[in-house]
């Protein structure tokens, strides 16, 4: 499903064909690559009534003592499962990934790749593409385009997600590579 003129697609939350739970994607980055990546943008813990929750680690840690990429990617994908409004309980994950886009582009791309694999609906794939993936490419175009092209070759689902990316200020050469990797016709 490709976004068209920013109109909501007809099948907003249709389960993807070949259903069943998505396979658990393996994180490709070593554990040390996640050191210092936590954005600290979790909702303030002090609004919780429960003192134990208020003192808990950031949400992206899950049940571990460090950022858990699988937990973050799964929560990020599930945040878009409810359609255009998403899921408020999981909105923190989208904010976390968006913060990563600016300071940790390689980590952000890995979370996006994993979230696409966890996605269960066309709508989730669309929102990830026209959201954080588009922002990431717009900000770090030449730094990550090679990895993006590789992921598009490896995964039809990632390629479909990439088809939802708009130009967002990318230079001509990078934009042509995005178009080609997503199966669209380059401009030249």
Indicate where each model-derived feature is located.
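A generic structural signal for solvent-exposed, polar alpha-helical segments
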Residues: 40, 53-54, 82, 172, ...
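Short linear motifs centered on Gly/Pro in flexible linkers and helix caps
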Residues: 1-2, 20, 31, 99
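Acidic, small-residue rich beta-repeat scaffolds with periodic aromatic anchors
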Residues: 55, 176-188
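Cysteine-cluster motifs in flexible loop/terminal segments that predominantly coordinate metals
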Residues: 20-46, 53, 57
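Alpha-helical solenoid scaffolds in large eukaryotic transport, assembly, and signaling factors
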Residues: 59-178
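Short Lys/Arg-rich cationic patches that frequently serve as NLS/NoLS or arginine-rich RNA/DNA-binding motifs
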Residues: 2-21
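Polar low-complexity intrinsically disordered regions enriched in Ser/Thr and small residues
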Residues: 13, 21-23, 39, 43, ...
């Amino acid at each position: 499903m490709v976004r068209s003129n920013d109109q909501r697609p007809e099948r907003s939350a249709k389960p993807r064909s070949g259903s069943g739970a998505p396979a658990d994607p393996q994180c490709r980055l070593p554990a040390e690559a996640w050191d210092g990546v936590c954005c600290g943008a979790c909702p303030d813990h002090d609004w919780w009534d429960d003192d134990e929750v208020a003192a808990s680690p950031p949400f992206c840690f899950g049940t571990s003592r460090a950022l858990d990429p699988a937990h973050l990617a799964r929560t990020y994908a599930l945040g878009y499962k409810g359609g255009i409004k998403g899921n408020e309980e999981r909105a923190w994950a989208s904010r976390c990934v968006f913060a990563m886009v600016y300071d940790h582009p390689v980590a952000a791309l890995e979370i996006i790749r994993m979230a696409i694999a966890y996605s269960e609906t066309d709508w989730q794939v669309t929102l990830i593409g026209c959201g954080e993936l588009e922002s990431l490419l717009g900000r770090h175009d030449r730094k990550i385009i090679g990895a993006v092209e590789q992921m598009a070759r490896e995964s039809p689902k990632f390629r479909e997600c990439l088809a939802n990316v708009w130009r967002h200020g990318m230079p001509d050469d990078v934009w042509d590579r995005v178009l080609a990797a997503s199966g669209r016709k380059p401009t030249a």
